[in-house]
Amino acid sequence: MALLLDTGPWVALLSRNDTHHRWAVEQFRRLTPPLLSCEAVVAETCFLLARAGFDPALALQFIERGVVQLPFALQDQISAVRALLKRYDNVPASLADAALIRLAEVHDSPLLITTDSDFHIYRRHGRQTIPLITP
């Protein structure tokens, strides 16, 4: 199984005043690293942490320690990601969302931890739901 990490749970874990903080703490206790993500999620996480008054470097420590790994290379997946952005332009999907959908497509058994309800809409390979851990 490939555990995929979205922005929401990562921010919630590091931000004690986040609505989903307790839920995120419990999930991170249960999940076995590494969690896979992408640089777009890292950028969103750092931005949201800074905006909430937290040190964005806290998120980077997860990468340094190997808790979060970034196996996704946008350059290698650009055509597929562009197609996903176009497909979900009515939602709309962010770059991070499209990258995570693609990451779910390239793994046989993905499980995505997210607080984003849009992932109930998104499909991998056109029709397959993405297995989720949500609050």
For each feature predicted by the language model, list its residue ranges.
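Charged, low-complexity surface patches
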Residues: 17, 51, 93
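PIN-domain endoribonuclease scaffold, especially VapC-family toxins
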Residues: 2-3, 22-90, 102, 106-113, ...
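Metal-dependent nucleic-acid phosphoesterase active-site entry motif
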Residues: 1-18
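Short, ordered loop/turn segments at secondary-structure junctions
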Residues: 117
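Conserved glycosyltransferase catalytic-site signature
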Residues: 94-98
